[in-house]
Protein backbone atom coordinates (compact mmCIF):
# COMPACT_ATOMS: atom_id res chain seq x y z
CA UNK A 1 0.00 0.00 0.00
CA UNK A 2 1.62 3.27 -1.14
CA UNK A 3 -0.23 5.22 1.59
CA UNK A 4 1.97 3.65 4.26
CA UNK A 5 5.19 3.18 2.27
CA UNK A 6 8.20 5.39 1.72
CA UNK A 7 11.57 5.38 0.01
CA UNK A 8 14.51 5.84 2.35
CA UNK A 9 16.83 7.83 0.09
CA UNK A 10 20.52 8.44 0.74
CA UNK A 11 21.71 12.00 0.16
CA UNK A 12 25.45 12.49 -0.27
CA UNK A 13 27.73 15.51 -0.33
CA UNK A 14 31.26 15.84 -1.72
CA UNK A 15 34.36 15.54 0.42
CA UNK A 16 36.23 18.84 0.67
CA UNK A 17 39.61 18.23 2.24
CA UNK A 18 42.62 20.23 3.28
CA UNK A 19 45.90 18.44 3.88
CA UNK A 20 49.25 19.10 5.55
CA UNK A 21 52.18 17.02 6.71
CA UNK A 22 53.15 17.94 10.26
CA UNK A 23 55.25 16.07 12.80
CA UNK A 24 52.29 15.95 15.18
CA UNK A 25 49.94 14.38 12.64
CA UNK A 26 52.30 11.78 11.26
CA UNK A 27 53.44 10.80 14.77
CA UNK A 28 50.00 9.22 15.24
CA UNK A 29 50.83 6.72 12.48
CA UNK A 30 53.12 4.88 14.89
CA UNK A 31 50.04 3.42 16.56
CA UNK A 32 47.18 1.21 15.46
CA UNK A 33 44.04 3.34 16.05
CA UNK A 34 42.25 0.42 17.70
CA UNK A 35 45.19 0.00 20.12
CA UNK A 36 46.23 3.63 20.40
CA UNK A 37 46.06 3.93 24.21
CA UNK A 38 48.24 0.94 25.16
CA UNK A 39 50.65 1.36 22.23
CA UNK A 40 51.14 5.04 22.97
CA UNK A 41 51.69 4.38 26.68
CA UNK A 42 54.18 1.63 25.90
CA UNK A 43 56.17 3.79 23.48
CA UNK A 44 56.19 6.81 25.80
CA UNK A 45 57.27 4.56 28.70
CA UNK A 46 59.77 2.23 27.03
CA UNK A 47 60.75 4.06 23.85
CA UNK A 48 62.46 2.01 21.13
CA UNK A 49 62.50 -1.07 23.37
CA UNK A 50 59.02 -1.85 22.08
CA UNK A 51 60.71 -2.87 18.82
CA UNK A 52 63.56 -4.89 20.31
CA UNK A 53 62.41 -6.20 23.72
CA UNK A 54 58.64 -6.42 23.43
CA UNK A 55 58.51 -9.88 25.01
CA UNK A 56 60.16 -8.58 28.19
CA UNK A 57 57.63 -5.76 28.43
CA UNK A 58 54.55 -7.93 28.06
CA UNK A 59 53.88 -8.32 31.80
CA UNK A 60 54.07 -4.56 32.53
CA UNK A 61 51.96 -3.78 29.50
CA UNK A 62 49.32 -6.28 30.57
CA UNK A 63 49.24 -4.84 34.10
CA UNK A 64 48.82 -1.32 32.72
CA UNK A 65 45.92 -2.45 30.50
CA UNK A 66 44.20 -4.09 33.48
CA UNK A 67 44.68 -1.02 35.71
CA UNK A 68 43.38 1.23 32.94
CA UNK A 69 40.27 -0.89 32.53
CA UNK A 70 41.06 -1.84 28.93
CA UNK A 71 39.26 -5.05 28.09
CA UNK A 72 41.17 -6.18 25.01
CA UNK A 73 39.85 -8.87 22.71
CA UNK A 74 42.04 -11.90 22.08
CA UNK A 75 42.84 -10.50 18.62
CA UNK A 76 43.89 -7.10 19.97
CA UNK A 77 45.91 -8.68 22.77
CA UNK A 78 47.80 -10.78 20.21
CA UNK A 79 48.47 -7.72 18.04
CA UNK A 80 49.65 -5.64 20.99
CA UNK A 81 52.32 -8.22 21.85
CA UNK A 82 53.29 -8.85 18.22
CA UNK A 83 56.65 -7.32 17.08
CA UNK A 84 55.41 -7.58 13.48
CA UNK A 85 52.36 -5.47 14.32
CA UNK A 86 54.52 -2.75 15.88
CA UNK A 87 56.88 -2.88 12.90
CA UNK A 88 53.97 -2.51 10.48
CA UNK A 89 53.09 0.89 11.92
CA UNK A 90 56.72 1.93 12.27
CA UNK A 91 57.12 1.37 8.53
CA UNK A 92 54.03 3.50 7.92
CA UNK A 93 55.51 6.30 10.03
CA UNK A 94 58.79 6.06 8.11
CA UNK A 95 56.97 6.46 4.80
CA UNK A 96 55.12 9.52 6.09
CA UNK A 97 58.37 11.11 7.30
CA UNK A 98 59.91 10.63 3.87
CA UNK A 99 56.86 12.19 2.21
CA UNK A 100 56.94 15.16 4.57
CA UNK A 101 60.60 15.72 3.78
CA UNK A 102 59.84 15.68 0.06
CA UNK A 103 56.57 17.67 0.06
CA UNK A 104 57.09 19.97 3.06
CA UNK A 105 54.54 21.24 5.53
CA UNK A 106 52.50 23.60 3.34
CA UNK A 107 48.72 23.46 3.75
CA UNK A 108 46.93 22.32 0.61
CA UNK A 109 43.34 23.41 -0.02
CA UNK A 110 43.16 21.13 -3.05
CA UNK A 111 43.45 17.52 -1.93
CA UNK A 112 43.58 16.39 -5.55
CA UNK A 113 46.84 18.29 -6.04
CA UNK A 114 48.18 17.10 -2.69
CA UNK A 115 47.48 13.45 -3.54
CA UNK A 116 49.16 13.91 -6.92
CA UNK A 117 52.30 15.25 -5.23
CA UNK A 118 52.29 12.33 -2.79
CA UNK A 119 52.07 9.85 -5.66
CA UNK A 120 54.94 11.60 -7.46
CA UNK A 121 57.08 11.45 -4.31
CA UNK A 122 56.30 7.74 -3.89
CA UNK A 123 57.51 7.05 -7.44
CA UNK A 124 60.57 9.25 -7.07
CA UNK A 125 61.78 7.46 -3.95
CA UNK A 126 60.72 4.04 -5.26
CA UNK A 127 58.79 3.10 -2.17
CA UNK A 128 55.82 0.83 -2.67
CA UNK A 129 53.07 1.40 -0.13
CA UNK A 130 49.94 -0.66 -0.62
CA UNK A 131 46.74 1.20 -1.47
CA UNK A 132 45.54 0.75 2.12
CA UNK A 133 48.83 2.06 3.56
CA UNK A 134 48.68 5.14 1.35
CA UNK A 135 45.07 5.76 2.36
CA UNK A 136 45.96 5.53 6.06
CA UNK A 137 48.68 8.15 5.60
CA UNK A 138 46.45 10.46 3.55
CA UNK A 139 43.58 10.15 6.03
CA UNK A 140 45.88 11.04 8.92
CA UNK A 141 47.09 14.29 7.35
CA UNK A 142 43.79 15.54 5.88
CA UNK A 143 40.60 16.99 7.32
CA UNK A 144 37.25 18.30 6.12
CA UNK A 145 36.99 22.00 5.34
CA UNK A 146 34.00 23.43 3.50
CA UNK A 147 36.26 26.02 1.81
CA UNK A 148 38.52 23.37 0.26
CA UNK A 149 38.18 21.99 -3.26
CA UNK A 150 35.97 18.97 -3.86
CA UNK A 151 37.87 15.68 -3.88
CA UNK A 152 37.67 13.81 -7.18
CA UNK A 153 37.17 10.06 -6.93
CA UNK A 154 37.36 9.40 -10.66
CA UNK A 155 36.28 10.63 -14.08
CA UNK A 156 34.14 8.54 -16.37
CA UNK A 157 33.27 8.65 -20.07
CA UNK A 158 29.54 8.30 -20.67
CA UNK A 159 28.49 7.86 -24.28
CA UNK A 160 26.25 5.65 -26.38
CA UNK A 161 24.83 2.52 -24.81
CA UNK A 162 26.62 3.10 -21.49
CA UNK A 163 25.02 6.53 -21.13
CA UNK A 164 21.59 5.28 -22.19
CA UNK A 165 21.66 2.43 -19.67
CA UNK A 166 22.59 4.83 -16.88
CA UNK A 167 19.85 7.30 -17.82
CA UNK A 168 17.32 4.46 -17.90
CA UNK A 169 18.51 3.16 -14.52
CA UNK A 170 18.29 6.60 -12.92
CA UNK A 171 15.14 7.56 -14.84
CA UNK A 172 16.58 10.97 -15.67
CA UNK A 173 17.92 13.05 -18.55
CA UNK A 174 21.59 13.78 -19.22
CA UNK A 175 21.08 17.30 -17.87
CA UNK A 176 19.84 15.85 -14.57
CA UNK A 177 22.86 13.58 -14.00
CA UNK A 178 24.47 15.98 -11.44
CA UNK A 179 21.47 15.31 -9.18
CA UNK A 180 22.62 11.68 -9.11
CA UNK A 181 26.34 12.29 -8.59
CA UNK A 182 27.64 12.63 -12.16
CA UNK A 183 29.05 16.09 -12.83
CA UNK A 184 30.23 17.35 -16.26
CA UNK A 185 34.00 17.89 -16.28
CA UNK A 186 33.98 20.39 -19.13
CA UNK A 187 35.36 17.80 -21.54
CA UNK A 188 33.06 16.17 -24.07
CA UNK A 189 31.15 13.19 -22.62
CA UNK A 190 33.30 13.15 -19.46
CA UNK A 191 31.81 13.24 -15.97
CA UNK A 192 33.38 13.68 -12.54
CA UNK A 193 32.42 11.48 -9.61
CA UNK A 194 33.40 12.98 -6.25
CA UNK A 195 34.41 11.29 -3.03
CA UNK A 196 31.61 11.44 -0.48
CA UNK A 197 31.93 12.99 2.97
CA UNK A 198 30.36 10.15 4.93
CA UNK A 199 29.81 12.11 8.15
CA UNK A 200 27.67 14.58 6.18
CA UNK A 201 25.58 11.82 4.63
CA UNK A 202 21.85 12.18 5.25
CA UNK A 203 18.66 10.36 4.35
CA UNK A 204 15.16 11.45 3.39
CA UNK A 205 11.87 9.54 3.63
CA UNK A 206 9.99 10.06 0.37
CA UNK A 207 6.39 8.79 -0.01
CA UNK A 208 6.11 5.89 -2.47
CA UNK A 209 3.55 7.79 -4.50
CA UNK A 210 5.99 10.67 -5.09
CA UNK A 211 8.95 10.98 -7.44
CA UNK A 212 12.28 10.80 -5.59
CA UNK A 213 13.82 13.31 -7.96
CA UNK A 214 10.94 15.78 -7.63
CA UNK A 215 11.18 15.54 -3.84
CA UNK A 216 14.95 16.12 -4.02
CA UNK A 217 14.54 19.22 -6.19
CA UNK A 218 11.92 20.65 -3.84
CA UNK A 219 13.15 19.68 -0.37
CA UNK A 220 16.92 19.14 -0.59
CA UNK A 221 18.65 20.97 -3.42
CA UNK A 222 17.48 24.49 -2.44
CA UNK A 223 19.18 24.02 0.94
CA UNK A 224 22.22 21.93 -0.10
CA UNK A 225 22.99 22.80 -3.74
CA UNK A 226 25.95 20.42 -4.08
CA UNK A 227 24.15 17.35 -2.69
CA UNK A 228 23.13 14.41 -4.83
CA UNK A 229 21.00 11.25 -4.64
CA UNK A 230 22.71 7.88 -4.26
CA UNK A 231 19.84 6.00 -5.84
CA UNK A 232 21.41 2.54 -5.50
CA UNK A 233 21.24 2.79 -1.70
CA UNK A 234 17.48 3.41 -1.72
CA UNK A 235 15.38 1.17 0.52
CA UNK A 236 11.63 0.84 0.96
CA UNK A 237 9.97 1.01 4.36
CA UNK A 238 6.49 1.23 5.82
CA UNK A 239 5.00 3.10 8.75
CA UNK A 240 1.52 3.94 9.95
CA UNK A 241 0.86 7.52 10.99
CA UNK A 242 -1.77 7.14 13.70
CA UNK A 243 -2.40 10.87 13.84
CA UNK A 244 -3.01 11.01 10.11
CA UNK A 245 -5.39 8.05 9.91
CA UNK A 246 -6.99 7.73 13.35
CA UNK A 247 -6.98 11.19 14.94
CA UNK A 248 -10.47 12.65 15.29
CA UNK A 249 -10.49 16.41 15.18
CA UNK A 250 -12.43 18.22 17.88
CA UNK A 251 -13.60 21.66 16.74
CA UNK A 252 -12.58 24.65 18.85
CA UNK A 253 -15.24 26.17 21.07
CA UNK A 254 -16.79 29.48 20.04
CA UNK A 255 -15.49 32.79 21.41
CA UNK A 256 -18.85 33.42 23.10
CA UNK A 257 -18.68 30.10 24.97
CA UNK A 258 -15.12 30.70 26.14
CA UNK A 259 -15.91 34.30 27.18
CA UNK A 260 -18.91 33.29 29.30
CA UNK A 261 -16.82 30.60 31.00
CA UNK A 262 -14.13 33.16 31.86
CA UNK A 263 -16.73 35.51 33.37
CA UNK A 264 -18.18 32.65 35.45
CA UNK A 265 -14.71 31.74 36.72
CA UNK A 266 -14.01 35.37 37.63
CA UNK A 267 -17.28 35.57 39.60
CA UNK A 268 -16.47 32.31 41.36
CA UNK A 269 -12.95 33.41 42.30
CA UNK A 270 -14.20 36.80 43.53
CA UNK A 271 -16.72 35.08 45.82
CA UNK A 272 -14.00 32.79 47.15
CA UNK A 273 -11.75 35.74 47.99
CA UNK A 274 -14.64 37.48 49.79
CA UNK A 275 -15.22 34.35 51.90
CA UNK A 276 -11.54 34.12 52.82
CA UNK A 277 -11.46 37.77 53.93
CA UNK A 278 -14.80 37.42 55.79
CA UNK A 279 -16.23 40.30 53.77
CA UNK A 280 -19.41 38.59 52.69
Language model features with spans:
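A conserved structural/catalytic subdomain of Rossmann-like adenosyl-cofactor enzymes
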Residues: 1-272
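Coiled-coil heptad-register positions
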Residues: 273, 277-280
